[in-house]
Amino acid sequence: METPPQTTRARLRGELLDDADIYHHVSELMQPLLLCYDSLVACNMYDIANDELSNIIRRVACFGLELLKLDIRQESGRHADVLAAITDYLKLGNYHDWDESQRQTFLLNELNNPRPLLPRQLYATADAPINAEPVKEVLATFNMLAQQPAGALGAYVISMAKQPSDVLAVMLLQKEAEVPHPMRVVPLFETLADLDNAPACLDALLSIAWFDILP
């Protein structure tokens, strides 16, 4: 169940791997284990079947391939910076200058829109906000999330969350990156003012009809 050293080194170098012998889903590992167990039981070899093999099956059932789920954490302002760069590129204005109502309207419209927010090929100067390294870093994080298998990811934690738009922003960026198994979004209210406003913020989020269609 350990990753071969050569596989780890290749991944660190960013090399493409022949993944034919790599498990991608827990069922791929569980199936042969259960087959072994059933075969041992059929041969009346109960002591062997119910010893170490049973322990391995329980561990796989509990922890999967990943052993634990990975949480992602990012500050709300970084998401706002990305959306400001996007709205600048699309010539829609400056997201930073919009009030909460304008932000929610924009975010919900895009969440409900089947088309991508950005074209796949960007035509922008090197010094354009959309090409800023902090913006590209956040977008790269979401693109990385889209490549992860189901069950590998836990929660996307937003530090310094303040308003409903902070949560909607992360949902939109997941949609834009085509994350196949969107992470649940957890706003973290940290200042006293934000903590006082947290109940109203959550009530506002839950009152949005778009949330009714979420699984």
Question: What are the language-model segments listed below?
Answer:
Residues 1-147:
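Extended, charge-enriched "interface" segments that sit outside catalytic cores
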